[in-house]
Amino acid sequence: MSTARFIKCVTVGDGAVGKTCMLISYTSNTFPTDYVPTVFDNFSANVVVDGSTVNLGLWDTAGQEDYNRLRPLSYRGADVFLLAFSLISKASYENIHKKWLPELKHYAPGIPIVLVGTKLDLRDDKQFLKDHPGAASITTAQGEELRKMIGAVRYLECSSKTQQNVKAVFDTAIRVALRPPKAKKKIKPLKTKRSRICFFL
């Protein structure tokens, strides 16, 4: 029996968007009621997706600026990134393009990204939005638009509290890691002897 392939999946995004809650919800089927900044221990377990068994390694990262130097150490060897923003935070949505995409392109170029909108249960919660005037709902269309803009492979929305779509997020990440999209080839001049000869003629 062959050993399961190891897949390293790293969550990235602003602080307090729900990255750690999403990981806890997926691995333990529980939802932490208090905000605790990144206390998720790296997790590894065998998971079956589409008949394939993989050893899924989950890595949590802290979004706060204090961790800007340490965070990229987690990116090494990543097979896929879950790039998360909150569906009730316009700032976290905008930071995907402003902060997180440039960081991932710099430290982990070419690694596929799955874009994830978190806190789905709160997006249509009128009472929550009324009690939090600063909250701004991000629509599915806006999420899909952002996915295209940053070149993410997929876009999903989930709620760690209700567990809606949480498993789908990680199943998608595994599928993407197993079958990464082919990079678009940039057309470069051929560096063959023949092309050099033609060039000088």
UniProtKB/Swiss-Prot annotation:
A GO molecular-function descriptor: GTP binding
Propeptide residues according to the Swiss-Prot or TrEMBL record: 199-201
Record Pfam families: Ras
Cysteine methyl ester PTM sites in chain numbering: C198
Localization: Cytoplasm; Membrane
Predominant location: cytoplasm
Motif segment (Effector region): 35-43
Binding residues for GTP: 13-20, 60-64, 118-121
Presence of keyword GTP-binding: yes
Record lipid sites (S-geranylgeranyl cysteine): C198
Tissue occurrence: Expressed exclusively in the root, hypocotyl and stem.
Membrane topology term: Peripheral membrane protein
Domain of life: Eukaryota
GO cellular component terms, A-Z: cytoplasm; plasma membrane
Any GO BP annotation: small GTPase-mediated signal transduction
Keywords linked to the UniProt accession: Cytoplasm, GTP-binding, Lipoprotein, Membrane, Methylation, Nucleotide-binding, Prenylation
PANTHER family recorded: RHO FAMILY GTPASE
Family according to the record: Belongs to the small GTPase superfamily. Rho family.
Function statement: Inactive GDP-bound Rho GTPases reside in the cytosol, are found in a complex with Rho GDP-dissociation inhibitors (Rho GDIs), and are released from the GDI protein in order to translocate to membranes upon activation.
Protein name (Swiss-Prot/TrEMBL): Rac-like GTP-binding protein ARAC2
Organism from which the protein derives: Arabidopsis thaliana (Mouse-ear cress)
